[in-house]
Amino acid sequence: MNIENLIKGINGLDNKVMSKIQKRLDNLTKPLGSLGTLEDIVKQLGGITGEVYPSVKNKTVIIMCADNGIVEENVSSCPKSVTASVTRNFMKGFTGINVFTRHAGADIEVIDIGVDADINEEGIINKKIRRGTSNMIKGAAMTRDEALKGLEVGIEAVKELKDKGVNLIGTGEMGVGNTTTSSAVASVLTGCPVDEMVGIGSGLTKEAFRNKIQIVKEAIALNKPNKEDPIDVLSKVGGFDIAGLAGCFLGAAIYRIPIVIDGFISASAALLAVKINPLVKNFIIPSHGSAEPGSKWIMKELDLEPMLNLKMRLGEGTGAALAFQIVDMAVFSYLEMGTFENAEIEPYKPLK
């Protein structure tokens, strides 16, 4: 796979289709623009797919699972073994994302991109780069080649889903320590002070929280990631799950399929992808504003506004699955509402 050529081949939205969708929206039996963001979503879907009547019936959340060497520094309240346990539990149907996708009419695709354990459960896709990243306060988290391999895993995952007829993708992750790596990546890419980017993750004491902030500062100071080179940032202070998800966002733009951000980790990956190619932003739909404090910095940098503010910080793709249902409503209203001709009434006219 020639990633560079694929990324260079990304194009923008189809403005002609978006204009046609706008015309239909303005002819539906409602005041002009009264469905707000729902109308924007439909236009975006059309601009991505080139379809005047877009469909999002086939939905999947991709969950990238990986361990992070930085957990050696006590940055998480959970032991590293939780990554493997939850990864396996995704196949048992009772995790948060299982419940959310079940009721959103969506599937999940679980990818082991770097879990520090042998994961042999049926249904889990093995794309393990290696068993967890290195401890980033002792050196780079991964090599540049490994970072590129992570992007490739995500791009390929999207292509395979597109080939199967999936037309809406969500992004999720599982990896103890990944709010630490995401904080480092996002702090470098946004210029946000580490103290304002780092949050409590899965839950930390005040002392552990202060330690987490210090660890992120030390990792950035040691590795000196180049803000102008997103792949350098990823390789030095990122994680395999972030790499895979960034690849998913790139893949969505390459293969023209809408993709939904979940929470903080997913947003960090989205930011990374947009820094690689700014056109990727056109293919991204935000879901919720994570309770992690750095989330607002990333959304500001992306110039995106979350649909929901529910103070969630579970991850796994749960916020994306929630947003699926809003996207569904956007499409249903566009496709199923009557027009002024149907209703035999005069259409609304724009105010001058």
UniProtKB/Swiss-Prot annotation:
* Keywords, sorted A to Z: Cobalamin biosynthesis, Glycosyltransferase, Transferase
Which species is this UniProt entry from?
Clostridium acetobutylicum (strain ATCC 824 / DSM 792 / JCM 1419 / IAM 19013 / LMG 5710 / NBRC 13948 / NRRL B-527 / VKM B-1787 / 2291 / W)
What is this protein's function per UniProt? Catalyzes the synthesis of alpha-ribazole-5'-phosphate from nicotinate mononucleotide (NAMN) and 5,6-dimethylbenzimidazole (DMB).
**Reactions this protein catalyses:** 5,6-dimethylbenzimidazole + nicotinate beta-D-ribonucleotide = alpha-ribazole 5'-phosphate + nicotinate + H(+)
Superkingdom of origin organism = Bacteria
Question: What are the TM regions of this chain, as residue ranges?
Answer: none
Gene Ontology MF terms in the entry: nicotinate-nucleotide-dimethylbenzimidazole phosphoribosyltransferase activity
Residues of the active site: E316
User: One GO biological process from the UniProt record?
Assistant: cobalamin biosynthetic process
Q: What is its EC number?
A: 2.4.2.21
Q: Which Pfam families match?
A: DBI_PRT (PF02277)
Question: What's this protein's name?
Answer: Nicotinate-nucleotide--dimethylbenzimidazole phosphoribosyltransferase
Q: Which family does it belong to?
A: Belongs to the CobT family.
Q: In which pathway does it act?
A: Nucleoside biosynthesis; alpha-ribazole biosynthesis; alpha-ribazole from 5,6-dimethylbenzimidazole: step 1/2
